[in-house]
Amino acid sequence: GVYASKIEHYIPDKDKKFWEKLYKIVKRLDGLQFPIKRGSREIDKHFGYFGFRYHPIKHKSNYFHIGIDIPNRTGTLVYPIASGIFEYSGFNETNGKYVLLSHPEIKTEDGFVLYSLYMHLSKFTVKFNRRQKFLREISFHTYPLLPIEATRALGRVGKTGNIHGTISHVHIQMEFRKKDVIVAVDPLLFFGMKTKENKSIEIETPLAFS
């Protein structure tokens, strides 16, 4: 079914040694790639890094951003971070048009599997047909399994969903999942890129930002 934006995420900040080791292992994997191939690879310095920020839509301070935002031109192709299994594509008011993949070959020793989520797309280019969607529902999302190669575009950068007043970008979210437990992780560390603190972290009111 639909990816629920209300799912609770657990942030891996209690056992830094474990997560640092995991990041190092994953970024050495073959086939891991940045989702944008053309245009800027820069992250929105005010609101787009993984971590605490001021939420530009909800107008809340000290809000934890569980992904990264990559500004780019509307229509720029978005690719998967690695080959995986297509789980869902759809639309909701928060995510806009989005695509969800699982990566069963990337998992922890205790069974947490990596998932990647691509949000605010202007369009998605992968979806289930009616028969496939029916089979997914009656099989509790276990059949059919549709492989997605890393070379296949998932969609295009856009402004759909709850991003009013912000520029076109794609939001990338990476999570390790096991049953009902979902742990959000910093996508930048998977690509060996430097993560930073959002510049909006100290904003307390909308008037404090210019």
Question: How would you name each of these model-derived features?
Answer:
Residues 75, 123-126, 162:
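Disulfide-stabilized cysteine-rich extracellular repeat microdomains
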Residues 47-49, 110-111, 116-121, 183-192:
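Short amphipathic beta-strand/extended segments with alternating polar/hydrophobic composition
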